[in-house]
C-alpha cells in the first residue's frame, strides 16, 4: 500500500539516488542483492512502499534509472548495489545531453522519454495504491534538468492526482560545474514551479560546508556529500516506510507545508550530523537535536533562513523519543524565535515521530522548512541568468536544438515572480488584511 515510484535522471540524480537506495536497504535489513536478512518485523512491515517483492525473499527497488549516456549507469551497475535494481529499469541513451537543457528536454531526451514512461507505467501498475513519484536530479546539467523536468511534466499528465516530489540539486553560489548552469537551472525552475508538488532544494556548496565545518573532513568527496543527502531523503521518507505514532506521507507533508501552490521549495536539515566513519560519541538529547537541526550552518541549501521567515516547517524525529518532549521543544522554539516565523500561520510546525532510528544512531531528526529565504538561491541564479542572457551568450546551443528566445524570457520572468511572491509573504503581517478588503465578496442578504 501507498507505494512510491522513484526516478533518478542524469549523472547527479543517479549518484544521489544510488546513495539513497544504499541507505534505505541498510535500514530495512536488505543486503546488496536485495535479500532480506534483518532482525525486526518492523523492517518488513512497510517495505513495499519502495520495494517490490520478487521470488526467493528478494526485494527489488521501484526505481527507474535514466540517463542520456551509459557511463553513470555502468558505474551504478558495477557498484556495490548494482545487483539490487531490475535490469529492465535501466533506460539510457548513447549521445549524452552535454550540459544542454534543450537536448535533455526537446531533442535527445524527448526521443528516450517514451521508453522511460513505459517502465514507469509498468512500475505504477505493480502498485496496489500508488502514492506518488519522487525524482532525484540536478538543475545545472542537461539530462537531470532538461529530461528530468520533461519526465515530470509527462508523468503529471498521465497521473494528475498523484504526488510529485523532487530532490533537486540546485547550483551553488561559488562552486559551479558548468558555465551554462544559470540557463539550465532557470529553465528547470520554470517547469518545477508548475509541475512539482514539493521540491527539496539541496546544494553542493552547503554540503561541502557541512562536511568541512561540522564533520571536519578536509577533502570531502561526492560520496560524502551524497551520504548527507541520502540521510535527509531517508528521513523525509521515514514515516512512509516504518510504522510510527504520528505518520505522515508525501501528501500530508505537502498539505502542511505548502500554503500557496507555487511556494513549494523546501530547505532541509538533518541531525545528528555524522560522517560515514565516525559516530556520535555522546548521548544525544531532543534539545540538542533540535538545536543542531535548526542551525543555519546545517541547512543543505546555501541560503540563510535568518534572512527570511518560515512559512511552515516540519520535523521528523526517529528513535525512542517522547512525544511530549518533542512538542514542548517545538513550542518553546516557536516562542523564542517568533520573529523567524510568519505570524499569520499560527501553528506552523508539524511533527512526525517514528520509533526506528537510522542505522548506527539512537535518535535522529530531519527538518524540512518552507522559508522565504530560499528566494536567495533563485535571486542569485536569476542574476547570473540575466547577465548572460542580456548578451545572448551561449544561446545558440539552445536555439539550434529548436528552442525559442521567448522561452528564456518566460522562464526568467517566472523566476522573478517567484522571488517577489516569497518577498511579499515575508513582509506580510497578520493584520494587514485591509488591502484585500475591497476584493472580498459582498454578502447580499
Swiss-Prot record:
GTP binds at residues 11, 69, 138, 142-144, 204, 226. CDD domains: beta_tubulin. The keyword Nucleotidyltransferase does not apply. Pfam families: Tubulin, Tubulin_C. It is found in: Cytoplasm, Cytoskeleton. GO terms for biological process: microtubule-based process. Its main location: cytoplasm. InterPro entries: Beta-tubulin_BS, Beta_tubulin, Tub_FtsZ_C, Tubulin, Tubulin/FtsZ-like_C, Tubulin/FtsZ_2-layer-sand-dom, Tubulin/FtsZ_GTPase_sf, Tubulin_C. One of its GO terms (molecular function) is GTPase activity. Keywords: Cytoplasm, Cytoskeleton, GTP-binding, Magnesium, Metal-binding, Microtubule, Nucleotide-binding. Residues 425-445 are annotated as: Disordered. It comes from the Eukaryota. One of its GO terms (cellular component) is microtubule. Residues 429-445 have a biased composition (Acidic residues). Its cofactor is Mg(2+). Mg(2+) binds at residue 69. Belongs to the tubulin family. Dimer of alpha and beta chains. A typical microtubule is a hollow water-filled tube with an outer diameter of 25 nm and an inner diameter of 15 nM. Alpha-beta heterodimers associate head-to-tail to form protofilaments running lengthwise along the microtubule wall with the beta-tubulin subunit facing the microtubule plus end conferring a structural polarity. Microtubules usually have 13 protofilaments but different protofilament numbers can be found in some organisms and specialized cells. Tubulin is the major constituent of microtubules, a cylinder consisting of laterally associated linear protofilaments composed of alpha- and beta-tubulin heterodimers. Microtubules grow by the addition of GTP-tubulin dimers to the microtubule end, where a stabilizing cap forms. Below the cap, tubulin dimers are in GDP-bound state, owing to GTPase activity of alpha-tubulin. PANTHER family: TUBULIN. This is Tubulin beta-1 chain. The lineage of its organism: Eukaryota, Fungi, Dikarya, Ascomycota, Pezizomycotina.
Amino acid at each position: 500500500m501507498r507505494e512510491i515510484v522513484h526516478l533518478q535522471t542524469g549523472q547527479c540524480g543517479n549518484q544521489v539516488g544510488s546513495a539513497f537506495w544504499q541507505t534505505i536497504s541498510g535500514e530495512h535489513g536488505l543486503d546488496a542483492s536485495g535479500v532480506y536478512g534483518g532482525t525486526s518485523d518492523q523492517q518488513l512491515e512497510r517495505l513495499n512502499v519502495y520495494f517490490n517483492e520478487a521470488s526467493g525473499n528478494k526485494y527489488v527497488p521501484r526505481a527507474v534509472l535514466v540517463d542520456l549516456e551509459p557511463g553513470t549507469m555502468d558505474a551504478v551497475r558495477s557498484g556495490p548495489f548494482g545487483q539490487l535494481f531490475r535490469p529492465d529499469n535501466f533506460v539510457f541513451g548513447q549521445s549524452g545531453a552535454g550540459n544542454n537543457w534543450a537536448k535533455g528536454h526537446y531533442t535527445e531526451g524527448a526521443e528516450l522519454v517514451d521508453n522511460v514512461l513505459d517502465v514507469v507505467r509498468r512500475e505504477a501498475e505493480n502498485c496496489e495504491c500508488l502514492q506518488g513519484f519522487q525524482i532525484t536530479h540536478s538543475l545545472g546539467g542537461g539530462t537531470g534538468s532538461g529530461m528530468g523536468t520533461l519526465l515530470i511534466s509527462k508523468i503529471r499528465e498521465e497521473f494528475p492526482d498523484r504526488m510529485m516530489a523532487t530532490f533537486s540539486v540546485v547550483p551553488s553560489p561559488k562552486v559551479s560545474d558548468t558555465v551554462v548552469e544559470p540557463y539550465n537551472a532557470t529553465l528547470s525552475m520554470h517547469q518545477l514551479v508548475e509541475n512539482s508538488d514539493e521540491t527539496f532544494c539541496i546544494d553542493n556548496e552547503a554540503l561541502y560546508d557541512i562536511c568541512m565545518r561540522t564533520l571536519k573532513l578536509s577533502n570531502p568527496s561526492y560520496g560524502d556529500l551524497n551520504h548527507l543527502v541520502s540521510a535527509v531523503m531517508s528521513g523525509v521518507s521515514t514515516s512512509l516506510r516504518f510504522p510510527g505514532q504520528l505518520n505522515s506521507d508525501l501528501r500530508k507533508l505537502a498539505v502542511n507545508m505548502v500554503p500557496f501552490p507555487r511556494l513549494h521549495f523546501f530547505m532541509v536539515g538533518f541531525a545528528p550530523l555524522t560522517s560515514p566513519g565516525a559516530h556520535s560519541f555522546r548521548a544525544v538529547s531532543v534539545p540538542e537535536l533540535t538545536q543542531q537541526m535548526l542551525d543555519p550552518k546545517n541547512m543543505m541549501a546555501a541560503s540563510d533562513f535568518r534572512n527570511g521567515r518560515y512559512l511552515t516547517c516540519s520535523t521528523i524525529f526517529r528513535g525512542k523519543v517522547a512525544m511530549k518532549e518533542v512538542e514542548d521543544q517545538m513550542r518553546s522554539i516557536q516562542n523564542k524565535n517568533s520573529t523567524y516565523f510568519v505570524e499569520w500561520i499560527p501553528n506552523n510546525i508539524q511533527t512526525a515521530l517514528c520509533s526506528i532510528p537510522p542505522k548506527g544512531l539512537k535518535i535522529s531528526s530531519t527538518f524540512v522548512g518552507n522559508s522565504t529565504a530560499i528566494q536567495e538561491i533563485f535571486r542569485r541564479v536569476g542574476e547570473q541568468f540575466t547577465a548572460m542572457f542580456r548578451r545572448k551568450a551561449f544561446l545558440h546551443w539552445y536555439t539550434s536544438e529548436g528552442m525559442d528566445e521567448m522561452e528564456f524570457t518566460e522562464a526568467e520572468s517566472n523566476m522573478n515572480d517567484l522571488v517577489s511572491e516569497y518577498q511579499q509573504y515575508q513582509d506580510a503581517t497578520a493584520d494587514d488584511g485591509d488591502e484585500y478588503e475591497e476584493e472580498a465578496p459582498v454578502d447580499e442578504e
